[in-house]
């Protein structure tokens, strides 16, 4: 099968590399290079670097419709997206001879939308997973083809869970695509009565409002990767970003007083200083 891949961040890399090593990937699409860091260095996204590593034709349009004339000239069976970062217009979805697919980091119909991993942790879910779905015009509403679950541990941060989901997807994708190649699959409509949404994380969400230990820990761990939850320490009069906490005492950790107990920040960054991660 000839495949076009569309994705951008590190989360997509293991799955895309597995697909590259087992199928005929004829093009890769990702977001444009961006300036990052304090020095604003122009940097290629991880998926762009992957395409260059394997000498696969790479396209980085500001808007994907810009490369519609190019895609129309290509002959491909599957169009697969994973954390690409743009909504794919229907005119492009219809170009694949077999299917246009999306790998989504939740067990749809739960957590449609922009932040399924963060919201699952924040809500205290104990399980999530990966869904391979046929893409539809409406975001994350397409028919489900395959799913695989993974446990969410109490101590998992967003980075931890992204790593679990990345491994899960990479381990499943060859079997899933082989089944599609051999027409050994079914497409199941999503149960609309069970749809939930994973709203984008907004700046107003980032401030820590100390609640119970459990709720505070979940929020901190959900926001740990990006952008990071913060509070204003009254003794220092500085903003402190908290990335990971423990319920048990850790030497040199920052003590956080919740409504029903204490948490200990083991990974944090005080405004104007470097990030600290305690063992």
Residue ranges and their predicted role:
Residues 1-38:
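N-terminal Rossmann-like dinucleotide-binding module
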Residues 34-52:
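N-terminal beta-loop-helix "entrance" segment that forms/cooperates
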Residues 65-75:
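Short amphipathic alpha-helix with an adjacent loop that forms part of the alpha/beta core around
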Residues 199-211:
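Acyl-group handling in specialized metabolite and lipid biosynthesis
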Residues 209-279:
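An anion-binding loop in the catalytic cleft
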């Amino acid at each position: 099968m000839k495949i076009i891949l569309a994705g951008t961040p590190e989360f997509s890399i293991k799955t895309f590399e597995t697909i590259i090593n087992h199928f005929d990937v004829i093009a890769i699409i990702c977001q444009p290079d961006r300036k990052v860091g304090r020095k604003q260095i122009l940097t290629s996204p991880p998926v762009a670097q992957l395409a260059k590593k394997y000498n696969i034709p790479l396209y980085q349009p500001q808007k994907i419709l810009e490369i519609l004339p190019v895609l129309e000239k290509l002959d491909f069976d599957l169009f697969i997206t994973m954390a690409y970062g743009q909504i794919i217009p229907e005119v492009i979805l219809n170009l694949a001879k077999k299917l246009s697919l999306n790998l989504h980091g939740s067990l749809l119909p739960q957590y449609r939308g922009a932040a399924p991993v963060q919201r699952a942790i924040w809500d205290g879910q104990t399980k999530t997973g990966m869904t391979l779905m046929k893409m539809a015009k409406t975001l994350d509403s397409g028919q489900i083809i395959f799913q695989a679950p993974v446990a969410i541990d109490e101590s998992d941060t967003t980075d931890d869970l992204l790593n679990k989901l990345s491994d899960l997807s990479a381990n499943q994708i060859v079997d899933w695509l082989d089944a599609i190649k051999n027409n050994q699959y079914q497409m199941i409509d999503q149960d609309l009565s069970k749809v939930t949404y994973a709203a984008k994380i907004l700046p107003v969400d980032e401030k820590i409002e100390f609640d119970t230990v459990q709720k505070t820990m979940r929020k901190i761990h959900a926001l740990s990767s990006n952008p990071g939850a913060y509070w204003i320490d009254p003794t220092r009069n500085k903003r402190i970003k908290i990335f990971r906490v423990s319920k048990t005492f850790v030497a040199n950790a920052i003590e956080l007083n919740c409504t029903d107990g204490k948490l200990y920040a083991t990974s944090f960054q005080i405004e104007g200083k470097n990030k600290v991660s305690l063992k």
